[in-house]
Amino acid sequence: MAEEQDLSEVELSPVGSEEPRCLSPGSAPSLGPDGGGGGSGLRASPGPGELGKVKKEQQDGEADDDKFPVCIREAVSQVLSGYDWTLVPMPVRVNGASKSKPHVKRPMNAFMVWAQAARRKLADQYPHLHNAELSKTLGKLWRLLNESDKRPFIEEAERLRMQHKKDHPDYKYQPRRRKNGKAAQGEAECPGGEAEQGGAAAIQAHYKSAHLDHRHPEEGSPMSDGNPEHPSGQSHGPPTPPTTPKTELQSGKADPKRDGRSLGEGGKPHIDFGNVDIGEISHEVMSNMETFDVTELDQYLPPNGHPGHVGSYSAAGYGLGSALAVASGHSAWISKPPGVALPTVSPPGVDAKAQVKTETTGPQGPPHYTDQPSTSQIAYTSLSLPHYGSAFPSISRPQFDYSDHQPSGPYYGHAGQASGLYSAFSYMGPSQRPLYTAISDPSPSGPQSHSPTHWEQPVYTTLSRP
């Protein structure tokens, strides 16, 4: 009993009364079999704000008395009796501005009052429970409680808050900065895991839109291999930044200017246009392209002044390729594939009949096709306008005949239309700009019934950069 007397003196000392939390782990086993005297000595000085904890500690002390044999309790008491509690260092904030002051914790809210009390009880009853599973269960139980069940915890939390305000009148909450601050805050507000569901939903939506972009890379739109902005079947919206992985053909080489511009116009990245009616906003989005400057488009043309003089290749073919690239907003050059007959240069007197096939979409109903005769040497060019109603203007021959044999006069010589490539492509209104164009197989065939998602004929050429 002398050891217990010494310990009770330590507990009743001023240092012991200032540090009730430090004593609580060791004081519970140090009580004798009667257990009452030591407990009353320890709890002679707590304020009214700790009455709820006092009752809980009494129950824990009684449970611990049954858990440990008498010899263990006496050994613990002997060790603790000679310990000077003034040597215990005070906790300090490592990254705080005032390192001399101890860190003051926030007052517990109602859920924390419930969770702390229930966690101690459940941890004693079910020691095999993992702490994370225990937290999930406590959160679920708290959400199932009605207002009458929550009332005692709410009242206790309010009382703790008022007591905390008295004890620390100049207290100011200063949260520690974390890298993932929003995620931690969401998990604190939703203790049961609602934050995880929200994060999973956002990730799932992002990968859904990314999946739509490369679902049919081989049978999609003609530019889908080199331009992931137009997913097959879902090409009903303005161009959005590429979201496909960088393992695809050229999605990693997308033009940063186009990405920045489309982000600036759209304002929201990665919108899934599969379920959006684009009829109302397409004109508004395309009207923003009126601010393009001619000098900005000049940088995509070859430096020697003419669109066409590239080696011994057909000049008209490269003139057409660069013009189509400028019109569709892509900086990729269209190389000459081995199996495609690009238009050949002939004297001005020889005119071969060719057709420009234009696909137009009415306001409602399936797309229909009109064949416009033109005195051009372009073999068979499919100019597809999937969204915008007016037909593509017929392209006449002198705009594409550039070679070493011919003077550059036809660049300005055509009287029926405005002069030059810019008149045919860059100055069209918002309802006439094509989103993508492609060079098709030269073998002429009759009008086929195309389904929007599967382009079987004509066979499109693959586009690559030299």
UniProtKB/Swiss-Prot annotation:
Biological processes annotated in GO: cell differentiation; cell maturation; cellular response to progesterone stimulus; cellular response to xenobiotic stimulus; central nervous system myelination; developmental growth; digestive tract morphogenesis; enteric nervous system development
Broad class of where this protein is predominantly found: cytoplasm
Region (Dimerization (DIM)), start-end ranges: 62-102
Domain of life: Eukaryota
GO molecular function terms listed in the Swiss-Prot or TrEMBL record: chromatin binding; DNA binding; DNA-binding transcription activator activity; DNA-binding transcription factor activity; DNA-binding transcription factor activity, RNA polymerase II-specific; DNA-binding transcription factor binding; identical protein binding; promoter-specific chromatin binding
Phosphoserine found at: 24
Gene3D superfamilies recorded: High mobility group box domain
DNA-binding region: 104-172
PANTHER family assigned: SOX100B (PTHR45803), TRANSCRIPTION FACTOR SOX-10 (PTHR45803:SF6)
Listed name of the protein: Transcription factor SOX-10
Underlying gene: Sox10
